C-alpha cells in the first residue's frame, strides 16, 4: 500500500472503497473560513474530499485564536483562505484547493458558486449574504447546509440539526428566515420545510456586559457594548468546532 492509499485507508474501511472514491470525486465549497468554516474545511480535507473551494476576504486576526484552526502566530495578517489552503494541501497534497479571497454576496454570486459544486456549506455571519447564498443554491438545486450563530455559547451538547424554517433560540437563523421571506419569496408558513439543513444550538445565549460580566438576557446588555468581532459575543472552539463537525 503506497502513501496515498495509506493516508485515507481509515476512510475506506469506514465508508467502503466506493465511498472513498465518491469523496475523492466530490467538490465542496466552504463559504466563510472563520470560527465554523475553518473547521469544516479541516474536516473535509481529512475526509478525502478531492476538491475544496474556500471563500473569505478576511485576514487572520490575533483575536481569532480562541476559535479558528488557522489562527496561528505566524499566520496573523495573512488571508484566511491562503492559510487554510496551505493547511489543506499539507494534509492531502492531492486535494485541489481554490482559495478565493472575496466575500460571496448577491453581486459576486455568479462568479463564485456554480452547479459544478456538489455541496455548499454556508458559514457566513452576514444575514444578507447568507440569505442570498441560500436562495441562489436553492434555485439552482445545489445542495446547501447552513449554520446558525456559534457565539455566546459554551455547551456543544446542545447543538442540533433541523430545517432552517424549524430552528429556535438562534437569532441569526431567524433573521435569515425573515430575509428569505421578504426578499426571495420563501414561504411564510411556520414549520414548512425549506429543505435547507441548519446547524444551530438550543442554548440560551450569553451576552457580554461593559463591566466584563455576562448575562443571558439581551435587554440587560450594557450601553456601549457593541456585538462585533472585537467586543461582541464570546466564543470557544469546543462549540465553534462542533458546529463545523456537525455541518
Model-predicted regions and their roles:
Residues 2-4, 115-117, 124-129, 144, ...:
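Glycine-rich phosphate/adenylate-binding loop
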Residues 49-92:
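Glycine-rich phosphate-binding loop and adjoining beta1-alpha1-beta2 segment
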Amino acid at each position: 500500500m503506497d502513501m496515498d492509499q495509506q493516508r485515507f485507508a481509515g476512510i475506506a474501511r469506514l465508508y467502503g472503497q466506493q465511498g472513498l472514491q465518491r469523496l475523492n470525486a466530490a467538490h465542496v465549497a466552504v463559504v466563510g473560513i472563520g470560527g465554523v468554516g475553518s473547521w469544516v474545511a479541516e474536516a473535509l480535507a481529512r475526509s478525502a474530499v478531492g476538491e475544496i473551494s474556500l471563500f473569505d476576504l478576511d485576514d487572520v486576526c490575533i483575536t481569532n485564536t480562541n476559535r479558528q484552526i488557522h489562527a496561528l502566530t505566524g499566520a496573523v495578517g495573512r488571508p484566511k483562505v491562503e492559510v487554510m489552503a496551505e493547511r489543506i494541501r499539507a494534509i492531502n497534497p492531492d486535494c485541489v484547493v481554490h482559495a478565493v479571497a472575496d466575500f460571496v454576496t448577491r453581486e459576486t454570486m455568479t462568479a463564485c458558486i456554480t452547479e459544478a459544486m456538489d455541496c455548499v456549506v454556508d458559514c457566513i455571519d452576514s444575514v444578507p449574504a447568507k440569505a442570498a447564498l441560500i436562495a441562489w443554491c436553492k434555485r439552482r438545486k445545489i445542495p446547501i447546509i447552513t449554520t446558525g450563530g456559534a457565539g455566546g455559547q459554551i455547551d456543544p451538547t446542545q447543538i442540533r440539526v433541523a430545517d432552517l424554517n424549524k430552528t429556535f433560540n438562534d437569532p441569526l437563523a431567524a433573521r435569515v428566515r425573515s430575509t428569505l421571506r421578504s426578499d426571495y419569496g420563501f414561504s411564510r408558513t411556520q414549520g414548512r420545510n425549506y429543505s435547507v439543513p441548519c446547524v444551530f444550538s438550543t442554548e440560551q445565549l450569553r451576552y457580554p456586559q461593559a463591566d466584563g460580566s455576562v448575562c443571558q438576557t439581551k435587554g440587560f446588555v450594557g450601553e456601549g457594548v457593541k456585538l462585533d468581532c472585537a467586543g461582541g459575543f464570546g466564543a470557544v472552539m469546543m462549540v465553534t468546532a462542533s458546529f463545523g463537525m456537525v455541518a
